Amino acid sequence: AQTAAQALIDALSTRQQLMTPPATATTVRGVLDALTRFMDVYATGEIPELRTPLDVSLFNTLRATLFPAHYPIPLTAHADNRGRLVETVRAHGGTGQTFVSTTHPGITRGEHFHLAKVERFVVVGGEARISLRRLFHDEVLDFHVTGAEPVVIDMPTMWVHNITNTGSTELTTMFWTNTLFDPANPDTYWQPVRPEGS
């Protein structure tokens, strides 16, 4: 679905009469084996190795199928007299990027969707509402999360999402994506989670 959506977006900026989206040869057994391998790893809250664009597409399809019933994913905190450590992302192979943001009370970040990006949110300090809406649908799902009990919310592709600081103190959120940010190809499309008038 993501490749088809990208082909439609690309078609808007070309004069070509015929466009052929990229394809990958595989078998039903190959797809089943990949999905099984991904689920075995993902069931533990970890990110499986995504070797090819087809792997990314299949993993995004699996995540969409599991959403929202699979979320939030609880995280284990390891505490001692120094404080606590929480492993938020364990990725099997590949590249990725982790970053942290702070958000003032009442402020919302996001209001966009992705076609291929695998993205994970973990609130590590403060309180927030993470809201998501599937493209072309009206229903909005809200997850109320807190840094006191960190959980994982992964953003499915083709779901508009945002995060709002609902607390009275600064919100600290850790994000992980499976790709390094590329300003020339950000895979980020603006759209509000709650359109005006809804």
Model-derived segments and their meaning:
Residues 1-75:
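Mid/C-terminal beta-alpha module of Rossmann-like enzyme folds, strongest
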Residues 71, 76-111:
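A short glycine-rich, His/Asp/Glu-containing loop-to-beta-strand
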Residues 94, 107-120, 147-148:
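A short beta-loop-beta micro-motif enriched in histidine and acidic residues
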Residues 94, 103, 123-125, 135-139, 160, 164-198:
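Double-stranded beta-helix
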Residues 116-117, 149, 159, 169:
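A generic "binding-loop/recognition-motif" signal
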Residues 116-134:
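Glycine- and acidic-residue-biased ligand/ion/polar-headgroup-sensing regions
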Residues 134-158, 164:
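Short acidic-glycine-tyrosine-enriched beta hairpin
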